[in-house]
């Protein structure tokens, strides 16, 4: 779990996302509260429930990007899902329970990685012994049993060479344990049955080893992973993963506005109101059956987001609104925001294009007036057509860089300055013609 303070979390998000300080503060506080809760006495800890968040804002202002960056900062089980992928129980499509199953699978992977790292030193020693056994087979007694006597002088010499890398390029044949992978194809909506059948068949198939010929340095890596996996207790791992999900799990549900029931629509809304009803018990707190065990969702943090351009937050079921007490509104981006997006983030769009062209030997330089003109063009097209936020910058920049990207391999050693004049020459015809900008930008 992340031990970062809210200020540190916001500072980390600022490196990638421009503006939206209110949304950053809300997720930073929610993430820090996960840590605060774990410091409380057991009895009080059970009473403190997470305050779920609803992020409201037009497309392209940073809702999904906040989720992506939060996943890296959280250091906890985190899953991002699209609300539109789910349907009501009984219909063809994914059921909402799969959210918790995916979250548990994610936690198992995380914990397994941690456990493998913990056992890496022991695994390294075991892998070293296995390689030495191949290079210098141990003597056998008269009954054919291997004798594990104290290391001989020759074995010590080979051990020293192995550690110094003198044997790295020697080829050896190693036994790698492997288990049969079973792939089962089922229709959508039957994920639970799939995982149960998969577990059953994997349990029935015996693990066996296969011989592979490789260099000593490659064999060492493979054998370390093999030995580390053997040292991990799967039952303890599952228990830790379930506990991690229950206490620290975070679920980000995007496009929640798309499952609002619209009053002007008739007929059955299979993927709308029914999905909301199915989400209620999971967000409120229930027990979900997964292949790793039963998972309680009482203390999982849910962050929902939506553009709410057609629907309104009040169109959500009242019970669901009550389970999302913290509302955060993300603001539309201005021309100044676009300028900052082009230059300030640690992996800004202009930097990406510069580095891409540098691989071909072409030096690209963006001047301040050129960046201002690009931002103005993107903002202007957003105003005249559909407002898709910062995503418009990708489209405008691709159009702007089209000629340079195409000819880059033949222009090695050249320098290109992208200033206001250059941007105007390339983009003005498209930006000023509303019909063209609607289809091209």
UniProtKB/Swiss-Prot annotation:
InterPro entries the record matches: AAA+_ATPase (IPR003593), ATP-dep_Clp_protease_ClpX (IPR050052), ATPase_AAA_core (IPR003959), Clp_ATPase_C (IPR019489), HslU (IPR004491), P-loop_NTPase (IPR027417)
Compartment annotation: Cytoplasm
Record-linked Pfam families: AAA (PF00004), AAA_2 (PF07724)
Molecular function GO terms recorded: ATP binding; ATP hydrolysis activity; peptidase activity; proteasome-activating activity
Keywords: ATP-binding, Chaperone, Cytoplasm, Nucleotide-binding, Stress response
GO BP term (any one): proteolysis involved in protein catabolic process
Record-listed ATP binding positions: 18, 60-65, 254, 319, 391
Residues in coiled coil: none
Domain of life: Bacteria
CDD domains to which the protein is assigned, alphabetical: RecA-like_HslU (cd19498)
GO-annotated cellular components: HslUV protease complex
Record text on subunit structure and interactions: A double ring-shaped homohexamer of HslV is capped on each side by a ring-shaped HslU homohexamer. The assembly of the HslU/HslV complex is dependent on binding of ATP.
PANTHER family per UniProt: ATP-DEPENDENT CLP PROTEASE ATP-BINDING SUBUNIT CLPX-LIKE, MITOCHONDRIAL-RELATED (PTHR48102), ATP-DEPENDENT PROTEASE ATPASE SUBUNIT HSLU (PTHR48102:SF3)
Functional summary from the UniProt entry: ATPase subunit of a proteasome-like degradation complex; this subunit has chaperone activity. The binding of ATP and its subsequent hydrolysis by HslU are essential for unfolding of protein substrates subsequently hydrolyzed by HslV. HslU recognizes the N-terminal part of its protein substrates and unfolds these before they are guided to HslV for hydrolysis.
NCBIfam families referenced in this protein's UniProt entry, alphabetically: hslU, PRK05201.1
Family the UniProt entry places it in: Belongs to the ClpX chaperone family. HslU subfamily.
Protein name according to UniProt: ATP-dependent protease ATPase subunit HslU
Species of provenance: Actinobacillus succinogenes (strain ATCC 55618 / DSM 22257 / CCUG 43843 / 130Z)
């Amino acid at each position: 779990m992340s031990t970062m303070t809210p200020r540190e979390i916001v500072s980390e998000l600022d490196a990638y996302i421009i503006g939206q300080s209110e949304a950053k503060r809300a997720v930073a506080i929610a993430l820090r509260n996960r840590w605060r809760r774990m410091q409380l006495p057991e009895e009080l800890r059970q009473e403190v429930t997470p305050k779920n968040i609803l992020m409201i804002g037009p497309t392209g202002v940073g809702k999904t990007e906040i989720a992506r960056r939060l996943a890296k900062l959280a250091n906890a089980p985190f899953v991002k899902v699209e609300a539109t992928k789910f349907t009501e129980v009984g219909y063809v499509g994914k059921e909402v329970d799969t959210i918790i199953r995916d979250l548990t699978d994610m936690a198992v992977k995380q914990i397994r990685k941690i456990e493998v790292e913990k056992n890496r030193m022991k695994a390294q020693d075991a892998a070293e012994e296995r390689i030495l056994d191949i290079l210098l087979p141990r003597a056998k007694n008269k009954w054919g049993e291997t004798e594990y006597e104290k290391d001989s002088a020759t074995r010590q010499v080979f051990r020293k060479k192995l550690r110094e890398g003198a044997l790295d390029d020697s080829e050896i044949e190693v036994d790698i344990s492997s288990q049969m992978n079973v792939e089962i194809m089922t229709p959508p909506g039957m994920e639970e049955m799939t995982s149960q059948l998969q577990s059953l068949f994997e349990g029935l198939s015996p693990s066996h080893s296969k011989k592979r010929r490789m260099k000593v340095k490659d064999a060492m890596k493979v054998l370390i992973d093999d030995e580390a996996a053997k040292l991990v207790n799967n039952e303890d791992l599952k228990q830790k993963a379930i506990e991690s999900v229950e206490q620290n799990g975070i679920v980000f549900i995007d496009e929640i506005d798309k499952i609002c029931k619209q009053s002007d629509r008739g007929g059955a809304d299979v993927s709308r109101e029914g999905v909301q009803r199915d989400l209620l018990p999971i967000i409120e707190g229930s027990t979900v059956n997964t292949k790793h065990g039963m998972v309680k969702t009482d203390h999982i943090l849910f962050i929902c987001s939506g553009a709410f351009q057609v629907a309104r937050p009040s169109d959500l079921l009242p019970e669901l609104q009550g389970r999302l007490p913290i509302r955060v509104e993300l603001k539309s981006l201005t021309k100044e925001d676009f300028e900052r997006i082009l230059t300030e983030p640690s992996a800004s769009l202009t930097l990406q294009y510069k580095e891409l062209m540098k691989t071909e030997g072409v030096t690209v330089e963006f001047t301040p007036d050129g960046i201002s003109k690009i931002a103005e063009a993107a903002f202007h097209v957003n105003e005249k057509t559909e407002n898709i936020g910062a995503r418009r910058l990708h489209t405008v920049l691709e159009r702007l860089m089209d000629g340079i990207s195409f000819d880059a391999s033949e222009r090695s050693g050249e320098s290109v300055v992208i200033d206001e004049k250059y941007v105007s020459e390339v983009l003005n015809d498209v930006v000023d013609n509303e019909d063209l900008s609607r289809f091209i930008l």
